[in-house]
Amino acid sequence: MAREKFERTKPHVNIGTIGHVDHGKTTLTAAITATLALDGNAKVKDYPDIDGAPEERARGITINTAHVEYETENGHYAHVDCPGHADYVKNMITGAAQMDGAILVVSAADGPMPQTREHILLSKQVGVPDIVVFLNKEDQVDDAELLELVELEVRELLSAYDFQVMTFRFAPGSALQAIEAISSNPAIKRGDNPWVDKIFALMDAVDEYIPTPERDIEKTFLMAIEDVFSITGRGTVATGRIERGVVKVGDTVEIVGVGDTQTTTITGIEMFQKTLDEGFAGDNVGILLRGVTREDIEAGMVLSEPGTITPHTNFESEVYVLTKDEGGRHTPFFTGYRPQFYVRTTDVTGAITQFTADDGSIVEMVMPGDRIKMTAELIYPVAIEEGMRFAIREGGRTIGAGVVSKIIQ
């Protein structure tokens, strides 16, 4: 069946909810869609829709990243609901990497919690430039001073991770109260109910404080592959977010990473189940590839303009090692340590071959909380380049975050 064509009328922004488990991220996502649907700018998604598959809901926590779309007066938004549970930081990294800005949800009744800090740190490491803070569950707080105290704590936390005070903005409210108000009166409008108005006010803040990112459309095309599937009779589709550049149907691209670099032609592009003639930096798309089998390609590889990126195994990087309080290791590690390097959309094992201090001296041991220059060698080549961010992981948890400073080989 022919798909509806995607119309580009407003600037496109990738956004998401971050914050501690049970502070109301998914409920807020539902409240935003319900509120914007009043103006015809969204399809209503209720909590179960966003929370995903049954086995994820059974534990009452969000495991995957759910994507919803909506519009405001000024922008078209693709919204990811990032998982909040510490076990699923890996998904948080894949989700947060897709954000031009974030809504940090903090329960006004509880204040900042360990995952609040962890998500702020991760947002910094994956390069989320702007944060709007939603102080949720305001209906559970009787004391205005308490609300101010929570705001102050969050402000200090954001400043500690170098988020400029200008780049975040606070909006109080209650996602649940807004949803209940809309459920009891679907004809409600802006100005009719204070809780619904607070969601509108939050989205006004998002429009104002999360600027339309300057897209890297002038640069060469690159997309990290998040998932791959086959469509019978049509071929293989690679999905992901276009990191930079523009890609058109008919373009020749390279598949880079793991094995030998392959060349293929793009036969189709889709976004939100609508067909596109071309995809731009920032778009979450599915790309149909000619003559590529499901076995030729896997998550973690990249699609790129031919000759623009090559796979490497050895690099130098600037790394921050998480403290115990941030969910990192309790003990030091040494040269020769072999953790996982989480690069764009995949885990690769690598050995740490050298630590170097700021003064150039060689260090044998690194403690939680240290910032260090680190040289690493991956077990197989992946597409990496200078300035690229990555996470260091061990046994399912993030223990460090880094940025590639120099490619060796």
Swiss-Prot record:
Main location: plastid
Entry EC number(s): 3.6.5.3
Sites where the protein binds GTP: 19-26, 81-85, 136-139
Pfam families referenced in this protein's UniProt entry, alphabetically: GTP_EFTU, GTP_EFTU_D2, GTP_EFTU_D3
Residues in the signal sequence: none
Keywords of this entry: Chloroplast, Elongation factor, GTP-binding, Hydrolase, Magnesium, Metal-binding, Nucleotide-binding, Plastid, Protein biosynthesis
Entry GO MF terms: GTP binding; GTPase activity; translation elongation factor activity
Gene symbol of the encoding locus: tufA
Region called G1, residue ranges: 19-26
Disulfide topology: none
Lineage of producing organism: Eukaryota, Sar, Stramenopiles, Ochrophyta, Bacillariophyta
Catalytic activity, reaction form: GTP + H2O = GDP + phosphate + H(+)
Boundaries of every tr-type G domain copy: 10-214
Subcellular location: Plastid, Chloroplast
CDD domains hit by this protein: EFTU_II, EFTU_III
Protein name (record): Elongation factor Tu, chloroplastic
Region (G5): 174-176
Listed NCBIfam families: EF-Tu, PRK00049.1, PRK12735.1, PRK12736.1, small_GTP
Function: GTP hydrolase that promotes the GTP-dependent binding of aminoacyl-tRNA to the A-site of ribosomes during protein biosynthesis.
Binding residue positions for Mg(2+): 26
Source organism (scientific name): Trieres chinensis
G4: annotated span: 136-139
InterPro entries to which the protein is assigned, alphabetical: EF-Tu_GTPase, EFTu-like_2, EFTU_2, G_TR_CS, P-loop_NTPase, Small_GTP-bd, T_Tr_GTP-bd_dom, Transl_B-barrel_sf
